[in-house]
Amino acid sequence: MDAKMKVERAAAGAAIDGVLKYVNHGDDRTKALLNLTDFVQKFTGNMFAEKTFDNIRTMLQNPDNKWVQYVNRGLDELDPQVIKMTALNLGFQAAFVGTKQIRMNREKYNCNIPWTMLMDPTSACNLHCTGCWAAEYGHKLNLSYEKLSDIISQGKELGTYFYMFTGGEPLVRKKDILRLAEEHHDCEFHCFTNGTLIDEEFCEAVQKLGNISFSLSLEGFEEVNDGRRGEGIFDKVLAAMDLMKKHGLLFGTSICYTRANLETVTSDEFLDLLIEHGCRYSWYFHFMPVGMDAAPELMPTVEQRKYIYHRLREIRSDKSDKQIFVMDFQNDGEFVGGCIAGGRNYCHINAN
């Protein structure tokens, strides 16, 4: 990190500290958030339209706005170190510094450079879920710590500061993930996990670091979830959520929707359960008939795909009171300019 970037990062950190200082003071918190908005607008220049910041200011001054309440709940419940490091690494480092760096290097090298990189530290997993695409790779493959760290170092030189882990089950390698997050403290890390290996000691380490977030796999309520993932897994995932919530960690869910569970996992009752246990967001991925014991009959119908397209937009809108940010990996492609594969915005390195 060069001297100029260090100064800019320190300034961004001070602005975030200014918000956190007033976390427990209603009027002062709003003022601090407005000041942070002014700082971001000045700092980013013409990177975003002026109207974007005007809309944010209007929203922040409306305490009844659902997304203002969402932000305030996060400030109340998330650990200050988690808030600061997420804002610095995902906001300043990845979205601001990284985006500029990537655009410059795309022109320089005349090739795609991903904004985020997905890596499989291992193909090993402690579960045996029906229809798991990752099982296609086997269970004995691993990327060494040195290889993982080297990939991240190379990525940072190009402007990539956001790294996601899947598998297998990435937390089979949780000691290495903690080590990576400490070594590359200017990066944001995200784990797609089944949640069963999350314990108190791990949560304490993540809380101290602040730059790791999580998406826990859940397929619906207990009967449906455990029917695909194994007996007792539903309760273990909820227990992991409660533990992470206690430590103020940032997490949500990763949901594979099928013909059988689509209505359930988008229902008000299910969303209320997620919110109650501390989830801030939920990823939705439609079932694909690949992997272990693939079942084509579980593919969503055309009508169901239409339904979830509109249902998730309804949940995000002011018409819904659900304070959880939902995203559909396939159906929300319009917001990232279409397909992100081929290194355009995303690259996947498996454990092979």
What are the residue ranges of the model-derived segments?
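Conserved alpha-helical substructure of the radical SAM core
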Residues: 34-201
